[in-house]
Amino acid sequence: MRRAASRLRVQGIRVLALSVLAIGLCISRSAIAQEKAPRFRVVVLAEQGGIHKPFVDSATEWLNALASQNDFAVDYIETTEKIDDAFLSHHQLFIQLNYPPYNWTPTAQAAFVRYIEEGRGGWIGFHHATLLGEFDGFKMWPWFSKFMGGIRFTDYIPGFADGMVTVENPSHPAVKGVASPFLVQKEEWYTWSHSPRANVHVLASVDEKTYSPGTKVKMGDHPVIWTNEHYKARNIYVFMGHHPDLFQNPAFATIFRNSIFWAAHQDENP
């Protein structure tokens, strides 16, 4: 009887140990599966060095925190060398973080055009993305100019200025919940050959009368946030993106966050 009871106890211990091991393996596999399957994946083409580095560094820190909180993954690249159809197929959102629309490889250009025109993913561009013209020995990219409303860069405010931005379409998901107007400080407001309004859906514009200090660098009707609905991809251009303190601006941070989830088709439950 004692031996039988002893054997039963040993068998019970073994069963318990195997059960604990099985549970542990299930938990481990579940954790690994979650790590391998983020909610969605973002690629960030970020300009490095020069005057834009502080903003890009702040954006990277902010993005990493947002990604951790919302279970999406971010991959950073600093050149267009990796960009092709296969690379972009792994990303539901492309963020052009102050990277200009020139110095792209031909393969990257062609893949990006397909990505946007066929709606393979979403796009958010900041600031330098409308530096359209002939720069650093590169010709203007005509397709990208059309994508941005047919504009060409003409001038900017080198000494920076504060300005009040008015939300024109508060019902759009990208600007939902943003107080209007809101102040943007220390920005080097660009001017373009003309307003893109006729070719895009304007979400917000800057009131040039509110520039402080005042300046002669103006263009009249001055959109600063817009989307081009002629393309299948959900896309947002946000002009602001020079000063790192923008991430302390609730309006800017909200627009960036909203735009990510909207452009990546995740806005149903951000």
Language-model features, listed with the residues they occupy:
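N-terminal secretory signal peptides that target proteins for export/translocation
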Residues: M1-Q11
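Bacterial N-terminal signal peptides
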Residues: R14-I27
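Extracellular ligand-binding/catalytic regions of CAZymes and related secreted enzymes
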Residues: E35-F40, A46, P54-D57, W62-Q69, ...
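Helical hinge/lid and interdomain linker segments adjacent to catalytic or ligand-binding clefts
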Residues: K36, R41-L132
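Active-site rim elements
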Residues: G50, F160-D162, A179, H242-N249
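A glycine-rich, often tryptophan-bearing local segment used as a flexible ligand/cofactor-contacting loop or short
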Residues: Y102-G177
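Catalytic beta-strand/loop cores that center a nucleophilic Ser/Cys/Thr
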Residues: G150-K232
